[in-house]
C-alpha cells in the first residue's frame, strides 16, 4: 500500500473515530497492524491536531465566550454571568493537568499495547457506552469542581489507552457525576484542545523529526482528510447523542472485537 493511500485511510479513520465513542487510537493501531504500517506515533498526534481544529470551529462561539470571560477575570472586571464560565474554565484546567499526568505515565508503556489489549479495551468501551446510555451509574458531585475535575481527568487519561474511547469515557464520567449529555459532550471536546496542544509542545522535537523523514504532502493530506471527515463526524455524533442511540456503538465494538479475534485467532 502506498504512503499516500495509507495517509488518506488513516485520515478517514481519525476523522470518523475521534468524535465517535469507538477509540481513534485503537482503530489506528488496528489498521497499522493489518497492513504492517510503521509510522511514528507523532503522525497520529498530527492527525489529532486536524480534528482539534474541527472542535475549535464547531465550538468557536463558546470558546470566544470563555476567552472573553477569562480576559474580564484577568482585568478584574467580571460580571455575575461569568461565574458559570469561570467554573468551566477551572474544570477544564484541572482535567487537563490530571489527564496530562496520567497520559504521560501511560505513554511509557506503549510497547505493551498489543492487538489483544486493544480488543479488550474495545469491549470495556462498549460496556461503558451501555452504562452511559441506560444511566446505569449516577453519583452527583459536579458541584465540587476539584473532585469533578480530578475524576474526569483520571478517566480521560485512561483514554490514552488504545481501544478506550477518550470521548466515550469522558462523556461517561461527566454523566456519572451529574452533567447532562450536552454539557458532558461540550466538556469532553473542549478539554481535548489544551491536551493535544500540550502533547505537541512536549513532543515538538519529534514533530520536527517527522517532517524531516516523511513526505510533507502525505502528512498534510492525511490531516486534511481527517479535518473534512471530522466535520461530518462531529455532527453525526451529536445527533446520535441526542437521539439516545449510542448503544449502536457498543454493538459495533463488540462485533468488531469478535470478528478480529476470529480471523486473527487470538
Curated annotation (Swiss-Prot):
Bacitracin is thought to be involved in the inhibition of peptidoglycan synthesis by sequestering undecaprenyl diphosphate, thereby reducing the pool of lipid carrier available. Keywords: Antibiotic resistance, Cell inner membrane, Cell membrane, Cell shape, Cell wall biogenesis/degradation, Hydrolase, Membrane, Peptidoglycan synthesis, Transmembrane, Transmembrane helix. It is an enzyme of class 3 (hydrolase). The keyword Cell inner membrane applies. It is a multi-pass membrane protein. This is Undecaprenyl-diphosphatase. It comes from the Bacteria. NCBIfam families: PRK00281.3-3, undec_PP_bacA. The chain crosses the membrane at residues 4-24, 39-59, 86-106, 112-132, 145-165, 182-202, 210-230, 246-266. PANTHER family: UNDECAPRENYL-DIPHOSPHATASE. Its EC number is 3.6.1.27. Its main location: membrane.
Amino acid at each position: 500500500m502506498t504512503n499516500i493511500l495509507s495517509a488518506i485511510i488513516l485520515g478517514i479513520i481519525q476523522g470518523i473515530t475521534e468524535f465517535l465513542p469507538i477509540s481513534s487510537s485503537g482503530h489506528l493501531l488496528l489498521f497499522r497492524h493489518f497492513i504492517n504500517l510503521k509510522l511514528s506515533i507523532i503522525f497520529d498526534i498530527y492527525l489529532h491536531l486536524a480534528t482539534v481544529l474541527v472542535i475549535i470551529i464547531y465550538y468557536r462561539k463558546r470558546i470566544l465566550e470563555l476567552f472573553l470571560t477569562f480576559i474580564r477575570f484577568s482585568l478584574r472586571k467580571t460580571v455575575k454571568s461569568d461565574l458559570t464560565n469561570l467554573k468551566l474554565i477551572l474544570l477544564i484546567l484541572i482535567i487537563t493537568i490530571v489527564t496530562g499526568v496520567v497520559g504521560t505515565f501511560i505513554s511509557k508503556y506503549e510497547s505493551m499495547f498489543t492487538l489483544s489489549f486493544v480488543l479488550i479495551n474495545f469491549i470495556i468501551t462498549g460496556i461503558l457506552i451501555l452504562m452511559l446510555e441506560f444511566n446505569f451509574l449516577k453519583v452527583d458531585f459536579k458541584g465540587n469542581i476539584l473532585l469533578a475535575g480530578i475524576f474526569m481527568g483520571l478517566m480521560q487519561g485512561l483514554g490514552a489507552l488504545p481501544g478506550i474511547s477518550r470521548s466515550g469515557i469522558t462523556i461517561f464520567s461527566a454523566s456519572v457525576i451529574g452533567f447532562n449529555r450536552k454539557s458532558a459532550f461540550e466538556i469532553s471536546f473542549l478539554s481535548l484542545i489544551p491536551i493535544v496542544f500540550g502533547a505537541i509542545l512536549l513532543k515538538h522535537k519529534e514533530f520536527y523529526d517527522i517532517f524531516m523523514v516523511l513526505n510533507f504532502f502525505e502528512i498534510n493530506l492525511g490531516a486534511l482528510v481527517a479535518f473534512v471527515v471530522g466535520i461530518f463526524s462531529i455532527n453525526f455524533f451529536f445527533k446520535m447523542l441526542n437521539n439516545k442511540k449510542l448503544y449502536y456503538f457498543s454493538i459495533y465494538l463488540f462485533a468488531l472485537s469478535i470478528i478480529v479475534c476470529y480471523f486473527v485467532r487470538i
